[in-house]
Amino acid sequence: VGAMAAILGLNFETVSQITNSSANDQVCQAANDNDPGQVVISGHKNAVEETIELAKDAGAKRAILLPVSAPFHCSLMQPAADTMAKALSEIILKDPIVPLVANVKANKEVNGETIKDLLVEQVTGSVRWRESIEFMSSEGVSEVYEIGAGKALSGMVRRIDREINVNQVFDTSSVRAAVLKLK
């Protein structure tokens, strides 16, 4: 039913225009603005496949389907967003000590109730990763930590802003090093 694809070599605005012209009666949305040359699309499989071809015609270097279990960050995820909203309505989320940068808004938030709304919104909304990193840089963030195996986010951060020092935390020794660095 749903699919996602990575479009390399086109910016978010261009890919958004392509998705708007290709979807016909099906959903296809720009789902992730990862870095200046990487955008992920999400929606109905046929619409995503059509958008891949249109993106290649528009000059994309590569456009490939991603092995995902669902079309995340698009309107097809509304039932999941509704379920999340119901679950979050039953809890109290305290205001954070450190501001949260919500990737759906690319801005900081300090109100727990608003953060609950943003968590729901991100299920169907575009991930504004590039803008979030740019915002954090403008706020003076000079150090980021990617926690977990892999280097995908670290690579994106480097392509967005080479001035930010990227640290990877993936095992016991790297956790210790991060803790020492943060003290």
Per-range role (PLM):
Residues 1-124:
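Alpha/beta catalytic cores of group-transfer enzymes, especially the acyltransferase/condensing modules
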